[in-house]
A protein has these predicted regions:
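Bacterial N-terminal signal peptides
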Residues: 16-29
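N-terminal secretory signal peptides that target proteins for export/translocation
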Residues: 1-11
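Residues at the start of alpha-helices and the adjacent loop-to-helix junctions
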Residues: 13, 26-27, 99, 172
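OB-fold and OB-like single-stranded nucleic-acid-recognition modules
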Residues: 35-218
């Protein structure tokens, strides 16, 4: 075999082995990456103790098994704060009045999401329509809802969205429905600049719905 042919065959062999090695590394790492993603849903460890969290006991409750009241995001943003508007209230304040009621938002769009490692809650920003400049409220899924969080995070990953400690925007907002308890948070930085209400749905269960299902809801 001529020297150039032998040299070319050797180069092709090296390139083939290199590509195979790279592909092997990529595919072998995928289960690990998937495990890390799903681990946030069920095995996230809070960085702050419950005593260091604002109204921790009030946030981390189970949803009541009662019929939910239908509500819209527009109606929620019209709610008046029930705890000293504009002032700080006790971090031990128990749930009362509206915060004891279960609500259902049948029409909303998931605009942004991140994980708060302080308490491991999923922070989700939803709007009444899919416009990126639309006003939003915050919805939080607590670690008590492991399976629901895992399902949501898996659906996000399937659409190429990475859910972690960084607040990220969805290029194409996702249609969702929400059921959960009303909750008034304290004033302060809580998400993007488009969030304009102290009222949240927290805890909540959030489900991605198909555009066809959303049309039926309308």
């Amino acid at each position: 075999m001529p020297i150039l042919e032998r040299f070319g065959a050797k180069i092709n062999s090296i390139i083939g082995l290199t590509i195979s090695s790279v592909l092997l590394c990529i595919f072998s790492s995928q289960p690990f990456l998937a495990a890390r993603v799903l681990d946030y849903a069920c095995s996230c460890q809070p960085e702050v103790s419950p005593k260091g969290e604002f109204r921790y006991e009030s946030k981390h409750v189970r949803l009541p098994k009662t019929p939910a009241e239908e509500i819209t995001i527009e109606e929620i943003t019209d709610w008046i704060p029930q705890y000293f508007p504009g002032e700080t209230f006790s971090p031990e304040t128990p749930r009362q009045d509206r915060e004891l009621r279960l609500f259902h938002i049948s029409h909303a769009f998931l605009q942004a999401a991140w994980i708060n490692r302080r308490d491991c809650d999923f922070h989700l920003e939803i709007s009444p329509n899919e416009k990126k400049d639309s006003f939003r409220i915050i919805v939080e899924m607590t670690k008590e809802y492991c399976s629901e969080r895992k399902e949501l995070q898996t659906q996000m990953a399937a659409k190429g969205f990475i859910l972690d400690e960084k607040l990220r925007e969805f290029e194409q907002p996702l249609p969702v429905e929400v059921v959960g308890l009303a909750f008034q948070d304290n004033a302060g930085p809580r998400g993007s600049s488009k969030v304009n209400s102290l009222w949240e749905i927290h805890p909540a269960i959030v489900k991605i719905v198909s555009p066809r299902e959303l049309q039926k809801i309308k």
